[in-house]
Each structure stands twice: as structure tokens, then as C-alpha cells.
């Protein structure tokens, strides 16, 4: 099911549409439009509520047909949950529930009126842009590698979702973020035999080539060797799929210093010589979701034509194993000149990132953010709801946390105290690539901090938030929303 969006200010009871979407709270209070339709239909919605057909519980919905006095042949009533707890998360869930409820209905046009609902500390533009993002997220279906019949069925159905309201800025931003999130999800969900480093580079270059103002440079292995990217290339040694460094640029801010985003692009992670085991390795196609997220953020920024300069860097590498693969106890030299003792080949993300972060210095960033599915330790600490945030800069932390709260793509700050740094000490090199059993997310952040000295830098660990686990799990597209909102706030 695909969606296209528009704004609509027509009176709901007379609008020409296949379905009007309204809400009801758990205490049986109707949304404003539900009240209007109830009055037009002679109290039909109230009667169904009294009979127990409409409970208002979050996650429930009921499709009503042919209400007297209402032009639309269908009215979808969505449960909103408890009114006093109705915040951004509940609003986003309600919109998603509405779209999922229409998946199998014979509907090609629907009017969503949930945008009229009051959401604490949010305005009308927020309601509209979050409605677009939530609806698009709920409508997403993976189809890239399905057989013809299943693909046709999954892609069938185009619904025009008219959102009740007039805040066009909210619609524009919402569509841009939704497109960026979907782009990131599409890349993240591809199997690793298709989404190789070269494929990722070529796909990204095609996007830049077809969007005026965007440019893309691809560095191959020889160029990375000339730059001295010994850490990145060490990880790449064991794979037949050769690495690429993707550099995207958007010049919307004249001569201003750019904001630089770096995303981990491990297209598949076997763990290398420290081979992963069953129960985790099968989800390692998602190890490039950091790269997918910063590319998705770039897509959103280009679509909304943000008036700033943005550079996105993705080290795209496969961590595989053959006779040439790097080993535990190897000492490698990074682009910065720092030497690194390899304690574990499955701690490869920080190795490709450290060279990419060093490369980013040449652009003199206004701020430098890296995004990575870096540590299982972060997932253990925060689960899948929150992205881990680490930085030495309180102002930057507050900017990112505020942006995440605003779009409900939230992060939680973890410390980068000096007490953790000595866990990375090495007898044989300048730094060890692992920090031991405890505080693994933090010591990974500490490792990266050694390659960002003098930079206004933050690290986002999305190991938990980048995907949903299990057989039906998928890439989430996070934190495209957080990053795009952060960039919007800088304009």
C-alpha cells in the first residue's frame, strides 16, 4: 500500500472521500470531528459506544458504514487511549493504527482528522508533519526481493491521505522526513548479497546525480590506501566485496561551515575471525543502518532544500573472513597516525568509523555526528526504544536530545568520563579496540572520542533502535527523524 498526501479543509460530514478517520478516547469522549459526525448521523456513534462496540482503547478501531447525514460511505473510529496520557507517542500510534486498519479496505481516498487532536506542547504543524511520517511508516511494505505475485499484492493500492488542516509547512517537512526514513529502511532491509559496498555507493551516487544541488564522490580502495586509511582497509581485507567511502554533499548554505554526518556502513558483519554465532549473525545485514540513516537524512535535507551545508560520509565495508582477514592481536595504523591493537575483530565498526571521522576533519565541521549500530551493550542498557548518545559537549547533547523529543525519535545520554578511557590502554599500540566486559557502549564511544579531538562531536549508538528483532523484524529508519529535526533547528 502506497500513500500520497494532501491537505484538506472541507467540512468532514460533506467531504467527498471513501473514509473519514476520527478518534475516541477511553473515557468515551469523541474527537471534535467524531462529535460532528455523531450529530449529523443522529447520535449513531454515541449509540455504538453505549453498546460497547467502541471502547476507545488504544490499538482498537472500528469501521462504520453508511452513517446517515455523512457523505463518506465509511467512518473509521480509532481508539486513542486515556485522554490525560495522550501525548506524542500516543498520537503517532493512533495515526499508524488508522493506516493499518485501512490496509485491506477498498479505499483509495481517506480524510484523516486526527490532526485536530490536542497534543501537549505541540502545534498544528507538528501534528501534520508527524501524521505524514507515522502514516508512511505504517504503510511501508518491503517488496524488493519478493516474487512477482507477492510483490504485486504488496504494492497494490494507492491511498490519497488527506490530512485535515492548513499548515503546509508541516506537510512539506513531514513528506521530506518520511521519504528519508523510507529510503533508509529500504536500504537497511535489503539482503547483503544485493546491498554490497559497491551497490550502496552506486545507489547513493544515483540519488545525488538526479537531484540538483547534491553531489557524490566515491573513494575506492586505491584512494583510501593513498589517504592511509589502514583501520578501514584492515576490516575490508577478508571480503571479496571491496570497500567504498561515500561522500555526499549538499550546498545550501553558501560559505558556511558544514554539518557532517558519518554513518557506519558494514553491509554484513560475520564478526571476522571472532566469528558471530547463531542467534545474532542472521540480523547482521542491519549493521549498515547507521550509513542508511545518514543517507536517509541527506535525502530529507535535499527534498526540503535545507539552507545549510551538509556532508554525509559512509564507510561501506563488509566484515567477512578468509585467509587474508585481519586477526586479534594485529596492530594497524589508522589515518590519524594512531596505532590500534585489535582485541576483537567483531569490534570492527569503530575501526572503519575512526578513519571516516579523521577524513571528516578536512571539512572543518560546524558539528560532527557519527551514527552506528555499534554495540550490543547499548541495546542491553537501553533496549530498542532509545538511541544512545555520547558527547563531551553539553550544548550539542541538548540540541540532539531536544530534536529527538520533538519528533519522538528519542535518545538517552551516556557518560564519556575519563575513568573509562584507561580500559582502552594497550601495551603494543596507542589504543586497544575493545574495553572489556563492562560499559561496552561507553568504551566504544571513548574509542571514537580519541579520533575527534578538537571537534564538536557526538556519537549516536543505534544498535537497539535501528531495527526490530525477530523473523518479521525490519529496519526502522531511525534516527532520520532526530537528525533531520536537528538540522532544521540549525536553520
UniProtKB/Swiss-Prot annotation:
- This protein's major location comes to cytoplasm
Cofactor binding annotation: Binds 2 manganese ions per subunit.
Q: Please list the residues that make up the active site.
A: 276, 350
Keyword ATP-binding included in the entry's annotation? no
The record's subcellular locations are:
Cytoplasm
Q: Where does Mn(2+) 1 bind?
A: 269, 346, 348
Asked if the keyword Cytoplasm belongs to this entry, the reply reads yes
* Reactions catalysed according to its record: Release of an N-terminal amino acid, Xaa-|-Yaa-, in which Xaa is preferably Leu, but may be other amino acids including Pro although not Arg or Lys, and Yaa may be Pro. Amino acid amides and methyl esters are also readily hydrolyzed, but rates on arylamides are exceedingly low; Release of an N-terminal amino acid, preferentially leucine, but not glutamic or aspartic acids
Q: Which residues are Mn(2+) 2-binding?
A: 264, 269, 287, 348
For this protein, the record's SUPFAM superfamilies field holds: Macro domain-like, Zn-dependent exopeptidases
Q: What does this protein do?
A: Presumably involved in the processing and regular turnover of intracellular proteins. Catalyzes the removal of unsubstituted N-terminal amino acids from various peptides.
Record family assignment: Belongs to the peptidase M17 family.
The name on file for this protein is Probable cytosol aminopeptidase
Origin species:
Xylella fastidiosa (strain 9a5c)
- Name the gene that codes for it: pepA
Amino acid at each position: 500500500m502506497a500513500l500520497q498526501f494532501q491537505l484538506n479543509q472541507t467540512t468532514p460530514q460533506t467531504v467527498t472521500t471513501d473514509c473519514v478517520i476520527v478518534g475516541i478516547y477511553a473515557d468515551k469522549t469523541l474527537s471534535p470531528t467524531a462529535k460532528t459526525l455523531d450529530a449529523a448521523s443522529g447520535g449513531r456513534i454515541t449509540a455504538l459506544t453505549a453498546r460497547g462496540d467502541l471502547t476507545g482503547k488504544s490499538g482498537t478501531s472500528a469501521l462504520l458504514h453508511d452513517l446517515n447525514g455523512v457523505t463518506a460511505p465509511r467512518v473509521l473510529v480509532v481508539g486513542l487511549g486515556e485522554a490525560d496520557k495522550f501525548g506524542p507517542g500516543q498520537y503517532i500510534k493512533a495515526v499508524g493504527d488508522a493506516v493499518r486498519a485501512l490496509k485491506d479496505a477498498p479505499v483509495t481516498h481517506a480524510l484523516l482528522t486526527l490532526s485536530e487532536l490536542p497534543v501537549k506542547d505541540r502545534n498544528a504543524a507538528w501534528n501534520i508533519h508527524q501524521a505524514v511520517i507515522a502514516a508512511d511508516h505504517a504503510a511501508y511494505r518491503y517488496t524488493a526481493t519478493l516474487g512477482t505475485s507477492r510483490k504485486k499484492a504488496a504494492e497494490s493500492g494507492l491511498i490519497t491521505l488527506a490530512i485535515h488542516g492548513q499548515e503546509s509547512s508541516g506537510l512539506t517537512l513531514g513528506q521530506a522526513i518520511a521519504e528519508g526514513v523510507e529510503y533508509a529502511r529500504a536500504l537497511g532491509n535489503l539482503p547483503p548479497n544485493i546491498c554490497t559496498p559497491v551497490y550502496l555507493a552506486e545507489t547513493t551516487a544515483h540519488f545525488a546525480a538526479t537531484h540538483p544541488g547534491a553531489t557524490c564522490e566515491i573513494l575506492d580502495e586505491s584512494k583510501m590506501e593513498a589517504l592511509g586509511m589502514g583501520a578501514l582497509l584492515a576490516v575490508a581485507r577478508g571480503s571479496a566485496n571491496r570497500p567504498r567511502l561515500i561522500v555526499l554533499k549538499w550546498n545550501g548554505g553558501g560559505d558556511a561551515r558544514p554539518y557532517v554526518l558519518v554513518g557506519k556502513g558494514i553491509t554484513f558483519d560475520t564478526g571476522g575471525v571472532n566469528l558471530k554465532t547463531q542467534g545474532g549473525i542472521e540480523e547482521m545485514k542491519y549493521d549498515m543502518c547507521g550509513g542508511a540513516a545518514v543517507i536517509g537524512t541527506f535525502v530529507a535535507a535535499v527534498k526540503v532544500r535545507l539552507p545549510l551545508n551538509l556532508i554525509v560520509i559512509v564507510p561501506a565495508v563488509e566484515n567477512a573472513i578468509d585467509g587474508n582477514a585481519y586477526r586479534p592481536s594485529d596492530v594497524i595504523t589508522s589515518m590519524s597516525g594512531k596505532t590500534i591493537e585489535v582485541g576483537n575483530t567483531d569490534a570492527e565498526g569503530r575501526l572503519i568509523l575512526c578513519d571516516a571521522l579523521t577524513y571528516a576533519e578536512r571539512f572543518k565541521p560546524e558539528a560532527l555526528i557519527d551514527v552506528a549500530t555499534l554495540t550490543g551493550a547499548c541495546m542491553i542498557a537501553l533496549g530498542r526504544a532509545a538511541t544512545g548518545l555520547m558527547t563531551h559537549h553539553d550544548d550539542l547533547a541538548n540540541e540532539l536530545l531536544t530534536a529527538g523529543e520533538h519528533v519522538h525519535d528519542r535518545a538517552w545520554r551516556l557518560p564519556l568520563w575519563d575513568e573509562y578511557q584507561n580500559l582502552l590502554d594497550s601495551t603494543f599500540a596507542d589504543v586497544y579496540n575493545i574495553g572489556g566486559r563492562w560499559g561496552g557502549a561507553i568504551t566504544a564511544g571513548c574509542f571514537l572520542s580519541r579520533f575527534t579531538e578538537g571537534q564538536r562531536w557526538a556519537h549516536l549508538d543505534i544498535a537497539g533502535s535501528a531495527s526490530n528483532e525477530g523473523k518479521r523484524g525490519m529496519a526502522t529508519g531511525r534516527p532520520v527523524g532526530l537528525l533531520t529535526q536537528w538540522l532544521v533547528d540549525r536553520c
